[in-house]
Amino acid sequence: MLAGPDADTIRARQLPGATLANAGAGIKIGIIDDGVDQRHPFFDPSGYTMPAGFPRGRAAYTTAKVIVARAFPPPGAAWKHAGAPYDPEESGHATHVAGIAAGNANTLANGARISGVAPRAYIGNYKALTVPTESGLGLNGNAPEIVAAIEAAVADGMDVINLSLGEPEIEPSRDLVALALDAAAAAGVVPVVAAGNDFEDFGRGSLGSPGSAADAITVGATTSGPSPAIAGFSSSGPTPLSLRLKPDVVAPGTSILSSRPDGWGLSSGTSMAAPHVAGAAALLLQRHPDWAPAQVKAALTVTARPLASADGGAGPTRSGAGLVDVSAADTPLVRPVPTGVSFGLVRADTLSTRSVTVEDAGGGAGAWNVAVELSGAPLGTRISVPPTVSVPGLLVLDLLAGAAEGEVAGAIVLRRDALSRRIPLWGRVEVPKLDVSGARTLVRPGVYAGDTRGRPALVTTYRYPEVPPGGPVTARLAGPEQVFRVRMRRPVANFGVVITQRGPGSRVEPRIVRAGDENRLTGYAALPLGQNPYVDEFGSPVPAAGALRPAPGVYEIVFDSPTAAGAGAFRFRFWMDDVTPPRATVVRRTVRRGDPVRVRVTDAGSGVDVRSIEATVDGKPVRAQLVGDEIRVSTTGLERGRHSLRLSLADYQETRNNENVTRILPNTRTMTSWITVLRP
């Protein structure tokens, strides 16, 4: 086990002239997270001078080391600490992350002396995650709050921002946080983002937003120590909707010792890997203050070290370009644009072409030999490149797809003498099998019937994400499929379906895909699983599937089953643009003890989710049951007199929502009412 942030593995201490006394000096790293504890000894301000124009935000939460302290609570936030830059009850994650990036050099921690990657850098504290979650994930925040934090960090003059946070990707053109990160990069700030920790549950295509941002440096995690390998949890590309090749690089992310509000602790995750790279970016900017964010990203990716594994390579969808090597990134020689190549989905027996502009990054001009090293490709598929490229110049890649399906993965390798530089590449050769010829078009929301019996069984696997066996939803659906079609002629907030009834023996499940292609799921929202981290049902099965903030276009709603024996009849509700919670009205506020309080509920959209119903009387949980269009709240055991009823309920769209919607819990209704209980 290593002590503290693992700067040695990423060769941060091998930079020419680098010492712990000056590493990162003058560079400002913004931590967009759940609030940094500026009082921690890892951020001791002794020996620092507050830079001109600072502090900013809440001065009481700043020091000469932590020079900005801001909070971004959502409108109407009820949590008592939501507006404070540090939450004494819930904050913790940001303090650990900030220590990895920029904790002071040679700080005593659990008997060892540890240092952040860029120990002399300043820290900006941007608390965008301010709301506690019922699912136990800690503080959270939605897109508007995270975007506000990004914009504030840019305005405050941060050089690097670190976001060790994430949510499932939505339609890229409508992803507010990812677009804000691209804008930050355009404004001169280096954005670094954690890749996520979903690989073991969701497999390939599990890397979400805002790591999906094109101009961000997205970071996966390796094990720590002298022989790093990809951490099992580290999320995998491609990004599920945009099909970008991510992550960009990897860095140590297991058992990292760093600061916690109560002292010190070990944590694992891509949340720990990202600040290693944020610190690395700070070191490079200290040495190359004229480098733009794209130059920092290119330097870190083109010089990264490929990782070995049992099958000969970790693969670019897990490792990106490889393990960060800060010393090599100091002299990248060449700068590829883009830094990685995604062919996306390529139909079998077709030709797909991509190009990379290779710029001179200083000392790289002239001829370089070009080769392609593939870690995998389906039979008959090949990638051709010219034997050389003259820098600066254009490098053209042709992917000639064969007849077989499968992923193409590897790297373009540029060589000159003993030097080499790498550009990762990925694509998938596909032969879509879904039969959409008889698909019924749904023209309006409502309740519909279906039956998969007697229909073709052509599709077994849906992607992306490509859920592995043993994941939280069924990985293989080998039964027959029934397909319905939806044409979105305008942008909507959402659409989806929920199975309301299954016939005897029916085990049908919904999936939603784009343009008749089972390889184009609408991301996590397409899976019958609770997606909302603010509620208890997060991660639990739910018979619903949908699309969040989808682009206009054609979508297919597919009902499938694990086996042919699970085919059968079903009924489902289809909704579109559901942004309001159910309505709830108490029928009678005075009842006899033992008789239920009846609350009439209606929902014209996705329908009431029975699992969401929670009731308390005088603050104590009581039984509440949905019967038809009424919720019946038990009065058993209540004393005669006046009582306070609190009822909470949501619809099925709430199970599809995540942090990329503009309000927290927009489809949840919470009502309070006084009730009077009489003698029986």
Predicted stretch roles:
Residues 18-142, 156-159, 186-188, 212-216, ...:
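Subtilisin-like serine protease catalytic core
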Residues 23-25, 125-215, 226, 239-244, ...:
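Substrate-binding/access-modulating region of protease and related hydrolase catalytic domains
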Residues 59-77, 208-282:
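Extracellular S/T/G-rich loop segment that most often corresponds to the catalytic His/Ser-adjacent loop
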Residues 98-102, 128-129, 159, 250-313, ...:
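Hydrolase catalytic cores
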Residues 249, 286-363, 422-448:
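C-terminal subdomain of the subtilisin-like protease fold in secreted/lumenal serine endopeptidases
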Residues 309-311, 327-340, 362-398, 505-510:
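Surface-exposed binding patches on compact interaction domains or structured appendages
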Residues 403, 507-574:
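Noncatalytic accessory or regulatory domains flanking protease catalytic cores in secreted, cell-surface
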Residues 468-531:
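Acidic, Ser/Thr/Pro-rich low-complexity intrinsically disordered segments
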